[in-house]
Structures are given as C-alpha cells and as structure tokens.
C-alpha cells in the first residue's frame, strides 16, 4: 500500500552510554529518524548538508545555533537551513524526531552521535 505507520514513543531503548538513533521511516522524499537522549547527553556541534526539521516528541533540549541557545520543549518544531552549525544538550530524557532530506545520509547522523 501507499501508507506506512510507525511510533516514535514505543519500543524506547535509551542508553546511559550514548544517544540512540534509528531510522523509523523512509519515504520518497525524506528520512525520519528517532534520536533518544538521556538527560545530560550532548550532540556536539555539527552541520547538515541539506535542510533539516527537528521535532520535539518528548522532553526538552538546549538547541545551540551559531552560538545562540534556543530552549526546545515537547511539541516544538524547528527548521534549519543547510550548513548551519548546531548542537543539542538534553535537559531531560528526550525523544527527537529528525527529518532529513532523502539526499542526506543517516550514516552522517550516526557519525555525529559516535563523535559526541
């Protein structure tokens, strides 16, 4: 069929050691990735080669963009243009929905997590 259904809030597998990323959905135009962050976990500053969307499913983060911190809480959604430096610090256990362009690589996100 032309429909897919997934849940961002089921089968949560948080890790105290590192952030957990998982591609939950891939469409003809996007990749939907779930990022699980424990309170205090940091995703170091990085850039995306294509625009991204960050949707706060649960929790809250300090989202740094070019040196300015934006507080994002449950339900918030932001867009970010390509090549803008940004970082994330979890202020509580957090579920993030990251929407990537189909042209972007999920492996890139995994590398950022591994290096954070």
Question: What is each residue range found by the language model?
Answer:
Residues 36-38, 48-62:
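Short, conserved beta-strand element in jelly-roll/cupin
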Residues 67-82:
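Short acidic-glycine-tyrosine-enriched beta hairpin
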Residues 43-45, 63-64, 80, 85-91:
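Short beta-strand His + acidic residue motifs that chelate non-heme Fe in jelly-roll/DSBH
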Residues 18, 31-48:
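Conserved short histidine dyad/triad with adjacent acidic residue
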Residues 1-29, 112-116:
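A short, N-terminal "cap"/entry segment at the start of jelly-roll beta-barrel domains
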Residues 82-106:
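Ligand-binding loop in jelly-roll beta-barrel domains
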Residues 57-58, 73-74, 92:
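A cytosolic small-molecule/anion-sensing beta-strand core signal
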């Amino acid at each position: 069929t032309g429909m897919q259904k997934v849940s961002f809030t089921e089968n949560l597998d948080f890790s105290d050691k590192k952030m957990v990323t998982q591609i939950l959905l891939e469409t003809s135009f996007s990749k939907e990735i779930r990022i699980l962050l424990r309170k205090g976990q940091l995703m170091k500053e990085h850039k995306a080669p294509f625009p991204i969307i960050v949707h706060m499913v649960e929790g809250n983060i300090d989202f740094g963009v070019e040196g300015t911190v934006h507080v994002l809480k449950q339900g918030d959604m932001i867009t970010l243009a390509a090549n803008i430096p940004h970082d994330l610090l979890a202020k509580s256990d957090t579920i993030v929905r990251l929407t990537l362009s189909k042209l972007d690589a999920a492996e890139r996100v995994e590398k950022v997590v591994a290096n954070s």
